[in-house]
């Protein structure tokens, strides 16, 4: 399970653990780069984190060769696991759960710029240049919405309809673009990252029904 921007596994993934236990599953909680107990100095909005996700998937497949896994992420972690889906993954990975991930680094950065009452189209090129010069990565080099066009794994998209940080419309865009088996589960009244707490019973039923055959 992969947490969001400037989060940590310990703080942000407690609800995810509860979901897993409710479905009779185990969970691996990952501190993403530049967070928690992990190293690193730059957050790349899921671009390099998606490669870390692939490494974790390979590690788990080696340690537990008889288990099946679902890549789960919330917020930036959701975009991370979606982007990881374009890379070669072990056969034990049977699905992806994206909880309120954004459609692309560029889209979420522009949205935050707009929230600051600045012109996104004018300001974004400077943010991008700063990321390239000082962060060593290009925000335009990765995109969840482009990744899901190549996805072959089943994807469970979920989002709170009242999310004012990552708009629910971004999950709708990702869902529409996704080429594999998919479902979009939205929760009225739920804010950012709160789709599960807002209606746990309905969430678990939808999740369990969708992945039932994959996890057999």
Task: State each model region's role.
Residues 43-64:
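Alpha/beta-hydrolase active-site loop
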Residues 161-166, 193-194:
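Acidic catalytic loop of the alpha/beta-hydrolase fold
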